[in-house]
Amino acid sequence: MSLDQAIPEALQALRTRFGAAVRAEQATGEAFPVLWLDASVWEAAHRFLREEIAAPFPLLADLWAIDESLRQHRTGQPASRITLCSHLVSLVRNADLRLKLATDGRAPSIAGVYANADWYEREAHDMFGLDFGRETRRILMPPTWEGHPLLKTHYARATEKPPFVLTDRLFEAEERATITDPDLLGLPKLRDGEELMVLNFGPHHPSTHGVFRILLGLDGEEVVWAWPDIGYHHRGAEKMAERQTWHGFIPYCDRIDYLGGVISELPYLLAVERLCGIAVPPRAQMIRVMLCEFYRIMNHLLFYGTMAQDVGAMSPVFYMFTDREKGHEILNAITGARMHPAFFRIGGVAMDLPTGWDAMVRGFLDWMPARLDEYERMVLRSELFRARTVGVGAYDTDMALTWGTTGPGLRATGCDWDLRKLRPYSGYEQFDFEVPLGQRGDIFDRTRVRADEMRESLKIIRQCLGNMPEGPVKADHPLTTPPPRGAMQKDIETLIAHFLQSSWGTVVPAGEATGQIEGHRGLTQYSVVSDGGTQSYRTRIRTPSFAHLQMIPKIVPGMTVADLVAHIASIDFVMSDVDR
């Protein structure tokens, strides 16, 4: 089946099966179709697409909601108070499909179809108050929180509500809320008549790699059950996006995944540029690719060292941090910052490459291959490391897709899925590189894949070094923000545009757009909704880490606590990426 036939065939099959319950196809600028369904077939349509259709859609990439109460530009869309959106991916078709449901605050659950919908529905309940007809606990906000933060009626800043006063009664209530009863979660306290030990692993344990708690039921050292508890790092990033200008939100993207640097900026800007109709110049595209691959290496070096450390090897992390500093020195010279560069712009990048950038990059490229060889001898060829990781924490491709796993965690199972190859963006189609794959889907393969990815990133950076085109680093487009400085100095129209964009903000045309990239942890996706104003009406941030943690309870039963620590390290997450 060709790509141009993949989606029309799926749409026709859906319409044939459900008829008038497929209410409308929304006209958008997206690269995939958007269908509105009737509530009566919401669950059945998802089951049909996942289990019954030829070349199915096994991956629920995202599930999110939009409060439509203040939205003005909704031509051709069914009336809705809160719209529920699901984003499905077919690997066989290499195609996406988005389904929408108009709700009055109630929606059918699809957790019985897509297992990973559980956390997404909990989030939609937490943020919007959606009722899915089943018991749904808050997931990001504390249980004592009043209201649903992503509703338009909910305040965005603390200054919009009375001063906070911590009374004795409130303190006691908050303290009680921190106690989690396994009975209320449906988790057993006994095994073969013996009482299990309930252990709080985190939220301040160094091996949780952030403020993350896992409630464990233990029989001796063996994990019987696990219940992840997230939200401690939640900062309301999606709410912040509604209060910032389109340009002003870029620095916040860096803090979604604070180890990813510009990688977190790119999907947001791809979405905004799609809405604006901006074509980014070739030089800016290649600069973006080069910097993204640098940050991919920076992240993987950190993972590599801490992965080894969590199974008892202390030396590698110190060597790898030293090499990370060499990379960060280059990034600092180019972007002006090490970890939070805010360097990409709507229509390009902030500035051109500095004088001498090529010598710095060439030095790094000459240095790193031998270092990676040394790390392979220290870690991957270590008998102790292999004994702790081979065959531990293994899962197959079907299980990975069931729980929304993407990136190295998916490719470690042997699944060749990398958006840089399959759906090239920002000029990735110009580069020659391989996609490293594993076989067993265990901790060792997840480590091996990331180690090999660093070598491929070096290949991409070397090609950027040898083929960097000349030309501008910002698009010549009225919505490029900020406009090219040279143009501002020559004509009054560009200067006026700069003044308006800097004071009021860029006016982005009404519509919806999605930016997808192959991030260092997996599929990173920004879905933005513009109502024709200077701020986003809705910004949905789909991060890979949120999906990856949900699979922990299915993987770790039967492990020892020590193996649990190794498995957590092999996921490679940061809690800001989970909690946003």
UniProtKB/Swiss-Prot annotation:
Topological type in the membrane: Peripheral membrane protein
Annotated Gene Ontology cellular component terms: NADH dehydrogenase complex; plasma membrane
Cysteine disulfide links: none
Domain of life: Bacteria
UniProt-annotated location(s): Cell inner membrane
EC number of this enzyme: 7.1.1.-
Region (NADH dehydrogenase I subunit C): 1-171
Alphabetic keyword roster: Cell inner membrane, Cell membrane, Membrane, Multifunctional enzyme, NAD, Quinone, Translocase, Transport, Ubiquinone
Region of interest called NADH dehydrogenase I subunit D, as start-end residue ranges on this chain: 195-580
PROSITE patterns associated with the record: COMPLEX1_49K (PS00535)
InterPro entries per UniProt: NADH_DH_suCD, NADH_Q_OxRdtase_suD, NADH_quin_OxRdtase_su_C/D-like, NADH_UbQ_OxRdtase_30kDa_su, NADH_UbQ_OxRdtase_49kDa_CS, NDH1_su_D/H, NiFe-Hase_large
GO molecular function: NAD binding; NADH dehydrogenase (ubiquinone) activity; NADH:ubiquinone reductase (non-electrogenic) activity; quinone binding
Assembly and interaction partners: NDH-1 is composed of 13 different subunits. Subunits NuoB, CD, E, F, and G constitute the peripheral sector of the complex.
Function (record text): NDH-1 shuttles electrons from NADH, via FMN and iron-sulfur (Fe-S) centers, to quinones in the respiratory chain. The immediate electron acceptor for the enzyme in this species is believed to be ubiquinone. Couples the redox reaction to proton translocation (for every two electrons transferred, four hydrogen ions are translocated across the cytoplasmic membrane), and thus conserves the redox energy in a proton gradient.
UniProt protein name: NADH-quinone oxidoreductase subunit C/D
